């Protein structure tokens, strides 16, 4: 009997040993909410070694950088909406709307509940500008027609008001004037920018960059009004709250500025900033967000108070420009940190996102642009064309998503 007992105990030990190996070999579950620039980077980097699940409302990635050109070159539309179907070899996508994110699970609109070992919140932001087709436009034809309609309105317009003179507003000017140059009197547009700040593009640009962008606008006969603002109509405010598209139609109106100026325009583009997609996390993480809804994170992109929950992109409270470059950097950091945590690395040894001096590359049409690297290096059209203006990173992100078939 002792002999049989010893065999039984030995078999139990062998079973427990192999069970522990199996548990150790099980892939950790990484749940990523949102698949923009940063979210897609995390998903791609962790796909081989983790059980990756991405939750997305849309079935295509939206290349917002290139979208400003699509409003005058609608044939680009099918290239800036990139299907996700080739991004992951092992992981999976769940297409749906997240209604609640908590420290232990994520709830979807259809009732599904998802758990995780590591959570990456990459919900991003939206804007009022006409560069993004409404969610219900899902086929290539529908998306093309959306941009074609806007391009026709811009073609008809004689005077265009750009409300907001940040980088997006200035890039829009570059695209419109490249398409309708001032020397073509029949098609040329009278363009006015109204900007609430004291200089165009960003408060982080140096004096040389500021002088160059002012000269560029002057050369293009663009009227620039600084330190003033247009009162946003109620219907536009509602669109901003609901994240729906305003009615982009040519219609001659007079707009009053806060300082009392009257501006006549028949087409308006609102580039007044972004709205964070914070609804899903703001309830359960109310102590971890700041007054504008950004999530408080440490240098490893971990949400304040949590080792296994991360935030990246526009929704972080990093004191930096919200750029594609920084979103991709966040993605790289989070992927490395998750790998290190799963390997038992000490939290003091984790990778950290470095807050770098601003890198600003401004496209002003396919052949022109301005670039500032760090706080003291400025470059003109040649470098800007290489970095951004020529292709607006269309090829870069087609490759990033493994060159899927275009939308049909």
Swiss-Prot record:
<comment type="similarity">
    <text>Belongs to the FAD-dependent oxidoreductase family.</text>
</comment>
<feature type="binding site">
    <location>
        <position position="314"/>
    </location>
    <ligand>
        <name>FAD</name>
    </ligand>
</feature>
<feature type="binding site">
    <location>
        <position position="69"/>
    </location>
    <ligand>
        <name>FAD</name>
    </ligand>
</feature>
<dbReference type="InterPro" id="IPR036188">
    <property type="entry name" value="FAD/NAD-bd_sf"/>
</dbReference>
<dbReference type="GO" id="GO:0050660">
    <property type="term" value="F:flavin adenine dinucleotide binding"/>
</dbReference>
<comment type="function">
    <text>Putative FAD-dependent oxidoreductase.</text>
</comment>
<dbReference type="Pfam" id="PF07992">
    <property type="entry name" value="Pyr_redox_2"/>
</dbReference>
<dbReference type="InterPro" id="IPR023753">
    <property type="entry name" value="FAD/NAD-binding_dom"/>
</dbReference>
<keyword id="KW-0560">Oxidoreductase</keyword>
<protein>
    <recommendedName>
        <fullName>Apoptosis-inducing factor homolog A</fullName>
        <ecNumber>1.-.-.-</ecNumber>
    </recommendedName>
</protein>
<dbReference type="GO" id="GO:0005811">
    <property type="term" value="C:lipid droplet"/>
</dbReference>
<keyword id="KW-0285">Flavoprotein</keyword>
<feature type="binding site">
    <location>
        <begin position="34"/>
        <end position="38"/>
    </location>
    <ligand>
        <name>FAD</name>
    </ligand>
</feature>
<dbReference type="GO" id="GO:0004174">
    <property type="term" value="F:electron-transferring-flavoprotein dehydrogenase activity"/>
</dbReference>
<dbReference type="GO" id="GO:0005737">
    <property type="term" value="C:cytoplasm"/>
</dbReference>
<keyword id="KW-0274">FAD</keyword>
């Amino acid at each position: 009997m002792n002999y049989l007992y010893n065999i039984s105990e030995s078999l139990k030990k062998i079973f427990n040993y192999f069970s522990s190996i199996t548990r150790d070999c099980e892939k950790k579950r990484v749940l990523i909410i949102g698949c923009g620039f940063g979210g897609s980077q995390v998903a791609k980097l962790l796909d081989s070694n983790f059980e990756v699940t991405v939750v997305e409302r849309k079935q295509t990635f939206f290349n917002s950088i290139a979208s400003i050109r699509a409003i005058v070159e609608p044939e680009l539309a099918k290239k800036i909406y990139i299907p996700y179907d080739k991004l992951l070899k092992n992981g999976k996508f769940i297409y749906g709307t997240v209604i609640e994110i908590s420290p232990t699970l994520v709830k979807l609109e259809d009732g599904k509940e998802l758990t995780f070992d590591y959570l990456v919140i990459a919900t991003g932001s939206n804007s009022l500008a006409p560069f993004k087709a409404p969610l219900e436009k899902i086929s290539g034809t529908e998306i093309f027609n959306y941009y074609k309609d806007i391009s026709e309105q811009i073609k008809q317009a004689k005077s265009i008001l750009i409300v907001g003179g940040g980088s997006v507003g200035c890039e829009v000017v570059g695209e419109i004037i490249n398409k309708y140059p001032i020397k073509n009197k029949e098609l040329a547009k009278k363009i006015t920018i109204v900007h609430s700040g004291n200089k165009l593009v960003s408060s982080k640009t140096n004096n040389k960059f500021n002088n160059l962008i002012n000269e560029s606008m002057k050369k293009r006969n663009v009227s620039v009004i600084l330190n003033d603002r247009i009162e946003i109509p109620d219907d536009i405010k509602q669109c901003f709250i609901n994240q729906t598209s305003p009615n982009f139609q040519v219609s001659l109106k007079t707009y009053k500025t806060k300082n009392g100026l009257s501006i006549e325009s028949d087409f308006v583009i609102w580039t007044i900033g972004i709205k964070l997609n914070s609804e899903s996390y703001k309830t359960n993480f109310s102590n971890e967000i700041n007054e504008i809804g950004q999530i408080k994170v440490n240098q490893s992109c971990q949400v304040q108070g949590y080792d296994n929950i991360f935030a990246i992109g526009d929704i972080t409270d990093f004191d930096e420009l919200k750029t594609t470059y920084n979103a991709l950097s966040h993605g790289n950091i989070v992927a490395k940190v998750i790998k290190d945590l799963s390997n038992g690395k000490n939290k003091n040894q984790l990778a950290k996102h470095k807050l770098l001096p601003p890198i600003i590359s401004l496209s002003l049409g396919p052949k022109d642009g301005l670039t500032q690297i760090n706080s003291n290096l400025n470059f003109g059209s040649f470098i800007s064309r290489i970095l951004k203006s020529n292709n607006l990173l269309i090829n870069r992100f087609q490759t990033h998503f493994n060159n899927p078939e275009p939308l049909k």
